[in-house]
Amino acid sequence: MLTPYKHEPFTDFSVEENRSAFEAALKNVEGELGKDYPLVINGERVTTDDKIVSVNPAMKEQVIGVVSKASREIVDDAFKSAETAFHTWKNVNPEERANILIRAAAIIRRRKHEFSAWLVKEAGKPWKEADADTAEAIDFLEYYARQMITLKDGKPVNSREGEHNRYFYTPIGVCVTISPWNFALAIMAGTTVAPIVTGNTVLLKPASTTPVVAAKFVEVLEEAGLPKGVVNFVPGSGTDIGDYLIDHPKTSLITFTGSRDVGVRLYERAAVVHPGQQHLKRVIVEMGGKDTVVVDKDADLDLAAQSIVTSAFGFSGQKCSAGSRAVIHQDVYDVVLEKAVALTKQLSVGEPTAPDVYMGPVVDQGAFSKIMSYIEVGKEEGRLMVGGEGDDSKGFFIQPTIFADVDPHARIMQEEIFGPVVAFSKARDFDHALEIANNTEYGLTGAVITTNRHHIEKAKRDFHVGNLYFNRNCTGAIVGYHPFGGFKMSGTDSKAGGPDYLALHMQAKTVSEMY
């Protein structure tokens, strides 16, 4: 009997024992760098000549690992493996499938600092961000296991006299999981185990910047007892195999987390029925945001400034939930701006292996160049208050940056930057603040800092985002507590870590029997 779900606690690094344990994990991971990682097809290791070289974004000359790349021919083999495994796996008792997730969670929990250390090295995450990523991965495993047990017998429906009716869920088929680099363990794990616990099989294509963490996770699933062929590990570039995975007639379900442009293109391609395809593909996408922290005139102004800074600069702003817009009532605008600038000047930027560094690097050269180009745009569109500098000589470091007095329709108020940049805009009143908050094509997260109950209720109704927070930052959703997913161009509102999520990976069946 499983205990009720409760989220994995974060590590308190002010405790010397925890700091020492994490430092030891970092040292151990240092000794593991540079190894080769094969593909996994039907439980077999497959090595290719074409490789992905994963590097440390804080120290770009340091190789984290070398991962084999899948070709289209190998992808075909992976589909055959997944299709064959599906015919057996779909009939496995849901509780047995759930137990594999529970065992995988226990393995990661025992090796929590190790996985977090890999995230520090491969994704450039500071200690606390890496620890939260690992904790979230554990949460997805524990939560989805329990959700599957809840759903295993279906839902009650009515029966008439002489008739017995059942309504239950069945798996869909082969799922293609395309996971992001910014939550290289948590989102990758969640979007892999949701399909498998519901009885589907998976082709996992992780982000090319963080494939080593994904390879380590596949090893955990094998150790937990996952049968061969249920998950097939097929890292590769989107150019080489991305479209091929989406277009393949054996693909039944696609789960994607990434940019708006790629997500929209994927959604369009998935609608096409290819020769040999006998089904419509189901698509789950999460595509980012342009998220706003709204500050009312009667807000706690210290809380407001801290919420803006935390939302904007955690993990260098590389979260789809990051608060890249601060919309502030004109009566308190200057005070909140001054407080936020002062807090930002206190933030440390550096090598994330150091325990007290707040911000590490951005993920790669492409991200660095894009963010720096937006900073140049920001200098034309607003008043640079702090930051604005970058250094890619050793790693990809950018200072936390605030622009003030930005027009609500300016590019840096409308376009997702995915970096440590926040734009401040002034609102006439609360209604105007909500109008600005809603004026983007995205609708993922938002926060409102206010003590006005009427305004809280108005924002609940009129602030059009999937995840809305009051009197706190707009990042840091917890599985089972804050089901996560957005409106508009932020995706399909497929609430990850919520009670409806697993049903998206299944199809409902009605059976009516007369007696």
From Swiss-Prot:
Active site: 286, 320
GO biological process, one term: proline catabolic process to glutamate
EC number: 1.2.1.88
UniProt entry keywords in alphabetical sequence: NAD, Oxidoreductase
Residues in the signal sequence: none
Molecular function per GO: 1-pyrroline-5-carboxylate dehydrogenase activity
Domain of life: Bacteria
Reaction catalyzed: L-glutamate 5-semialdehyde + NAD(+) + H2O = L-glutamate + NADH + 2 H(+)
Pathway entry: Amino-acid degradation; L-proline degradation into L-glutamate; L-glutamate from L-proline: step 2/2
Family: Belongs to the aldehyde dehydrogenase family. RocA subfamily.
Alphabetical list of PANTHER family matching this protein: DELTA-1-PYRROLINE-5-CARBOXYLATE DEHYDROGENASE 1, ISOFORM A-RELATED, DELTA-1-PYRROLINE-5-CARBOXYLATE DEHYDROGENASE 2, ISOFORM A-RELATED
Protein's name according to its UniProt entry: 1-pyrroline-5-carboxylate dehydrogenase 2
Organism of provenance: Halalkalibacterium halodurans (strain ATCC BAA-125 / DSM 18197 / FERM 7344 / JCM 9153 / C-125) (Bacillus halodurans)
